[in-house]
Amino acid sequence: NVDYRAPRLLSAERLAGAADEVATMQGTSRARRVCELMLEGSASPMETVPGLMLTLPVDFGGYGLEKPQLNHSIDVLAYRGSLSDWDAVTPDFLWAAHGVVLEYDSVKFHATRGTTQLERDAVRANTLTALGYRTFRATVQTLGTLPGLALLARQLAHALGTELEPTTPLQDLRRRKLYLQLMPKVRNLTGGNSILINTL
């Protein structure tokens, strides 16, 4: 078993600082670029995968969406007892300035935590919706095909008030390649549940 809630060892800021300290060495500019593209706060690999696909630049194979905050706590204490049972809720992906949330429904996580976790997730989603957040859901099936992921990206782009950048054939090829590199791990991350990887 893996505990994805373990404290992180290094932040993007600290890694960028280390690269700045050895600025004359080979590879530091690439390290700084990686820091700019990193998503911090992921609670599992299957949050990282859609996060990268959705936010990496189109030239890198992503959809180029604005980076969200991952697992960022929202204070809802003022609504406790009326719209919420909690002091805070923590969505998987949060675009706070746009009031948009994306929740990843993990088969493995829910299988190990049972219906209680499903109920908590439903209450959290309802709380966020009641507070005016536009709440989107992603499942293993949603992410299991590139067309499914593309639809989710278009829906999120619309909610964020933007349009996806048109792609060239080369960028489409890079997107399929990135998807295939990230998604083969999905069988291990879903508790052995096999899903179809379809890039058509």
Give the residues covered by each predicted segment.
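Surface segments flanking catalytic/ligand-binding clefts of nucleic-acid enzymes
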Residues: V2-L200
